[in-house]
């Protein structure tokens, strides 16, 4: 499995025939993406906030990708002509590339539109399994005891928010790593805005139970 960090909480994930984006809030300043939007097969949306729903609609128009998200966001996107696969918290499903499980998150999920707020259902995260590897994207979340249940998934790589204020801060993200037991932890959702300023180096220093890889924007990690 190959991932490329696209900034904030956005990642490109490639494994076999799957070429996916997670929470595509993607800066226009990207210079070396390892993918073409036209080739994207799937888009995972953890919740409805604009910094996670991102450029989903424009990417789908270019790629005809299937969006995997919760039921309420699916209804909203389907009203815009988007092909969606609906899930909900705790559900696991088999896709053509492997399996997906939707996990709990402590956050909000309202979708902001010109007409007002649209219900975005429950926020979540995803465990994506493909070619014998498991990737966990936590979405935006506070620390929760439910994360201890993820240890049974034997996750290879966990993508965890560390920015605080809206999500876990460094201290709680360190606890989350211990709960989850992933082989590798990668920090995300920090330093995009002043209110979520955090030190990934401090996170790395404090984690004792897993490897930590700090990815620069556009950096690629293979596992």
From Swiss-Prot:
Q: Which InterPro entries match?
A: Metallo-B-lactamas, RibonucZ/Hydroxyglut_hydro, UPF0173, UPF0173_UPF0282_UlaG_hydrolase
Alphabetically list the UniProt keywords: Hydrolase
Q: Which Gene Ontology molecular-function terms are recorded?
A: hydrolase activity
Instruction: State if Nuclease is listed as a keyword.
Output: no
Domain of life according to the entry: Bacteria
Q: Which SUPFAM superfamilies does the record associate with it?
A: Metallo-hydrolase/oxidoreductase
Q: Name one Pfam family in it.
A: Lactamase_B_2
User: Hydrolase among the record's keywords?
Assistant: yes
In terms of HAMAP family, this protein maps to: UPF0173 (MF_00457)
Family named by the database record: Belongs to the UPF0173 family.
Entry's PANTHER family?
UPF0173 METAL-DEPENDENT HYDROLASE MJ1163, UPF0173 METAL-DEPENDENT HYDROLASE MJ1163-RELATED
The protein's name: UPF0173 metal-dependent hydrolase Amet_4625
**What organism is listed for this UniProt entry?**
Alkaliphilus metalliredigens (strain QYMF)
């Amino acid at each position: 499995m190959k991932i490329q960090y696209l900034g904030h909480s956005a990642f490109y994930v490639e494994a076999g025939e799957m070429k996916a984006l997670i929470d595509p809030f993607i800066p226009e300043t990207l210079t070396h993406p390892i993918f073409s939007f036209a080739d994207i097969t799937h888009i995972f949306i953890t919740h409805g906030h604009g910094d996670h729903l991102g450029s989903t609609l424009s990417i789908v128009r270019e790629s005809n990708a299937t969006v995997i998200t919760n039921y309420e966001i699916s209804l909203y996107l389907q009203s815009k002509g988007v092909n969606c696969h609906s899930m909900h918290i705790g559900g696991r499903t088999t896709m053509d590339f492997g399996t997906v499980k939707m996990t709990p998150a402590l956050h909000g999920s309202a979708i902001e539109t010109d007409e007002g707020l649209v219900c975005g259902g429950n926020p979540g995260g995803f465990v994506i399994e493909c070619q014998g590897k498991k990737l966990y994207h936590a979405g935006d979340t506070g620390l929760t005891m439910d994360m201890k249940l993820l240890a049974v998934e034997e996750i290879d790589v966990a993508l965890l928010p560390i920015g605080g204020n809206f999500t876990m801060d460094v201290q709680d993200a360190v606890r989350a790593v211990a709960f989850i037991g992933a082989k590798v932890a990668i920090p995300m959702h920090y330093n995009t805005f002043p209110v979520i300023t955090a030190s990934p180096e401090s996170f790395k220093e404090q984690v004792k139970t897993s490897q930590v890889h700090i990815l620069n924007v556009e950096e690629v990690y293979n596992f």
